[in-house]
């Protein structure tokens, strides 16, 4: 389990994150929401070890994150950044295969996992294509497959961090992507996903961390976190929140 206690982060004189406490339990999807500049991507950068906090602790499986060696950490923690770019004409299967580099499972097993991850990301039909020939949305799905392959099959002890994985996707693939993430968590992985779409978060996340200017406004179930009062305070928007008529999760409608 990835755990954060009393996290503070500053950039110069600007406090970006203030006293954040967070747990990513196995089998759950935690959504991080908030307006631009709320500290969402900065939080992910601390959680993956890219940035060191000014105060507080980040632990993975009870050990300080900084104590994990590179390959050992990579076998348990995978990160999909907001922008993933490659400047070389790799085939899609090679890009996804990069996720298997921390493992020593052999070429045959790796090929099976690459196929499974591409199918999970609805990108198997792209397997022989050049990465550089893909659209932005196709590239995003290929990189999702790469991080899924890195942790496949997503058992307990695996942690997946995703920064806006649906930002370039059409409505169909927004749902297929988050369905794949949901299935990964159902296998035992802990997942944190940064999203901007409130309704996608309400549908697919078990808990919501709602950030406001680097502070935790709410950390609760979608029903408890995504209230009209909270969304007015954080986003400045007036909304109607009602239960989805078929699925029961909160449905947010802008007034």
Swiss-Prot record:
Subcellular location: Cell inner membrane
Functional description taken from the UniProt entry: Part of the ABC transporter complex HmuTUV involved in hemin import. Responsible for energy coupling to the transport system.
Subunit structure: The complex is composed of two ATP-binding proteins (HmuV), two transmembrane proteins (HmuU) and a solute-binding protein (HmuT).
Identification of the protein by name: Hemin import ATP-binding protein HmuV
Membrane protein topology class: Peripheral membrane protein
Entry keyword set: ATP-binding, Cell inner membrane, Cell membrane, Membrane, Nucleotide-binding, Translocase, Transport
Top-rank taxon, per record: Bacteria
Documented EC number(s): 7.6.2.-
GO molecular function: ATP binding; ATP hydrolysis activity
Family according to the record: Belongs to the ABC transporter superfamily. Heme (hemin) importer (TC 3.A.1.14.5) family.
Cellular component aspect of the GO annotation: plasma membrane
Domain ABC transporter: 2-238
UniProt: ATP binding residues: 34-41
SMART domains in alphabetical order: AAA (SM00382)
PROSITE patterns recorded: ABC_TRANSPORTER_2, HMUV
């Amino acid at each position: 389990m990835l755990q954060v206690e009393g996290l503070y982060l500053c950039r110069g004189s600007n406090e970006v994150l203030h006293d954040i406490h967070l747990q990513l339990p196995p089998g759950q999807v935690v959504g991080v929401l908030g307006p631009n500049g709320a500290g969402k991507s900065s939080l992910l950068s601390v959680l993956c070890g890219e940035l060191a906090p000014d105060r507080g602790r980040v632990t993975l499986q009870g050990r300080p994150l900084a104590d994990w060696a590179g390959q050992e950490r990579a076998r348990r923690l995978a990160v999909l950044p907001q922008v993933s770019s490659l400047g070389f004409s790799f085939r899609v299967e090679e890009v996804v295969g990069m996720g298997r580099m921390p493992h020593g499972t052999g070429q045959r097993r790796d090929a099976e996992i690459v196929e499974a991850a591409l199918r999970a990301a609805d990108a198997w039909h792209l397997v022989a294509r050049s990465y550089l020939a893909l659209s932005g949305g196709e590239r995003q799905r290929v990189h999702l497959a790469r991080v899924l392959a890195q942790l496949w099959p997503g058992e307990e002890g695996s942690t997946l961090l995703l920064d806006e994985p649906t930002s370039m996707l059409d409505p169909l693939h927004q749902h297929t992507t988050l369905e794949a993430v949901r299935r990964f968590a159902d296998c035992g992985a802990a997942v944190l996903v940064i999203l901007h779409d409130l309704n996608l978060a309400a549908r697919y996340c078990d808990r919501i961390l709602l950030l406001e200017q680097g502070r935790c406004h709410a950390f609760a179930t979608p029903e408890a976190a995504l209230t009209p009062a909270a969304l007015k305070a954080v986003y400045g928007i007036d909304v109607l929140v009602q239960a989805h008529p078929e699925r029961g999760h909160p449905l947010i409608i802008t007034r």
